[in-house]
């Protein structure tokens, strides 16, 4: 970073850049000897391309400037700093703390831990439905379940004495079965949750013939439309937009729900809207009406965020460019996670924490909503900039005041010292 920043010597600058990329292992893609060959070829090609005498001979638009190198190295440094936080997992596991799930004490168990291998695999783009049957192959007169390539993995060998050197052994990898019936974008894939899928979607399905060791049986598969309906009704609406509206419209209570109209839904605090959504809230028992998690924002943060969204998108050319940055932050930390997790019904806990980044992104638009209101006051009320800014700030100040007033009781940590005491004792 220093060499590319000072730009005193182009040779040293190129060497430092190549060494950084090489030492991070970026060019060494693959496994075994092939990764070494690929890495050497990539480093050699990069060194040839960045050589000062080559850079002076090629067209200016193809040259790598010191600024580009510096930016690339800074980005790489930020990535390394971010990934270095994973070292805490290994350090903590090595200390053998009471809670040490999967004991990720070496590079192999750390990979399994980060890959969430203890939770199994979930199909994302193509795979089985909850009613799919394992494909069968006939071998020597027997029906054998068809398995995919399992590969292998390395695990640490248990020591027989403290003086024994560390060693690792190779074991067969995870066994994956192949299914005879598959579908695109499978959202209802878990055979353990079949009754729960049917609670969320009225599944009629369609029959598919299946050869079960010479016996032809019919397997009822959900249709693609039923699959999409579950995606929208449960995974998107219940497991994302419900949490989103908790933060920007209002929350019924903090009791975990599974789709009931009295537990954990989003509300607005506006009676006629809430009556349409979840029924008359005045008919709820007192313990639910007085729940500390009952928070109403009257959709004010949501409205302010939408104003900020449209103001940024239509403000100028620079505004639309900034809008796409915030939008992709909002999407990748929200809906993209929904697509990746492919969650089943009856989760053990509310999962709103998984989408906190998406809510932070929308909060950026909430802040920009103030600028949008200032622009509206100037354009439609013909106000001067300073009076418009003062009036918009005063009006919008009621939004965070309402949020704080509603959520203070269910977020008050006064007198709670368990977390601090555990940390101090440890």
Residue spans of the language-model regions?
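Membrane-proximal, lumen/periplasm-facing interface regions of secretory-pathway glyco-
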Residues: 352, 389-426
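Membrane-interface junctions at the ends of membrane-embedded or membrane-associated helices
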Residues: 2-11, 50-63, 315-319, 363-389
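Hydrophobic/aromatic-rich transmembrane helices and adjacent perimembrane loops
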Residues: 335, 347-372
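Transmembrane alpha-helix segments characteristic
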Residues: 75-81, 297-304, 317-340
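Signature aromatic-anchored transmembrane alpha helix within multi-pass, membrane-resident enzymes
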Residues: 18-21, 71-80, 313, 368-404
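Membrane-interfacial loop-to-transmembrane alpha-helix junctions, especially the N-terminal start
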Residues: 7-18, 67-75, 316-330, 385-391
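Lumenal/periplasmic acceptor-binding loop at the mouth of the active site in multi-pass
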Residues: 93-309
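Membrane-interface catalytic loops of GT-C/OST-like multi-pass glycosylation enzymes that act
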Residues: 6-7, 11, 28-41, 92-96, ...
């Amino acid at each position: 970073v220093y060499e590319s920043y000072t730009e005193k010597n182009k040779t040293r600058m190129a060497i430092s850049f190549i060494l950084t990329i090489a030492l991070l292992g970026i060019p060494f893609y693959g496994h075994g000897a092939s990764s070494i060959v690929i890495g050497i070829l990539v480093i050699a090609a990069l060194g040839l391309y960045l050589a000062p005498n080559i850079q002076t001979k090629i067209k200016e638009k193809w040259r790598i400037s010191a600024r580009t190198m510096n930016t690339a190295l800074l980005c790489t440094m930020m990535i390394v700093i971010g990934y270095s936080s994973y070292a805490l997992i290994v350090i903590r596991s090595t200390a053998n703390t009471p809670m040490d799930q999967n004991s990720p004490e070496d590079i192999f168990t750390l990979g399994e831990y980060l890959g969430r291998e203890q939770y199994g695999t979930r199909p994302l783009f193509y795979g089985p439905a909850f009613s799919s049957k394992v494909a069968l192959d006939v071998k020597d007169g027997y029906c054998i379940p068809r398995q995919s390539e399992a590969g292998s993995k390395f695990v640490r060998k248990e020591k027989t004495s403290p003086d024994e050197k560390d060693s690792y052994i190779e074991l067969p990898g995870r066994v994956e079965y192949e299914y005879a019936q598959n579908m695109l974008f499978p959202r209802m894939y878990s055979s353990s949750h079949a009754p729960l899928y049917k609670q969320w979607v009225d599944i009629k399905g369609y029959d598919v013939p299946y050869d079960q060791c010479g016996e032809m049986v019919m397997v009822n598969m959900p249709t693609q439309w039923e699959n999409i309906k579950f995606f929208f009704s449960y995974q998107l609406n219940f497991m994302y937009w419900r949490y989103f509206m908790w933060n920007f419209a209002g929350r019924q209570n903090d009791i975990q729900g599974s789709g009931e109209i009295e537990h954990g839904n989003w509300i607005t605090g506006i009676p006629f809207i809430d009556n349409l959504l979840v029924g008359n809230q005045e008919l709820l028992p007192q313990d639910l009406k007085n729940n500390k998690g009952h928070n109403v924002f009257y959709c004010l943060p949501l409205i302010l965020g939408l104003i900020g969204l449209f103001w940024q998108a239509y403000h100028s050319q620079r505004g639309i460019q900034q809008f796409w940055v915030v939008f992709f932050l909002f999407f990748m930390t929200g809906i993209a996670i929904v697509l990746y997790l492919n969650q089943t019904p009856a989760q053990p806990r509310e999962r709103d924490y998984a989408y906190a980044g998406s809510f932070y992104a929308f909060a950026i638009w909430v802040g920009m909503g103030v600028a949008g209101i200032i622009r509206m006051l100037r354009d439609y009320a013909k106000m001067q900039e300073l009076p418009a800014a003062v009036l918009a700030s005063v009006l919008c100040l009621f939004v965070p005041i309402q949020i704080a007033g509603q959520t203070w009781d269910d977020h008050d940590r006064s007198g709670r010292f368990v977390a601090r005491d555990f940390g101090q004792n440890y």
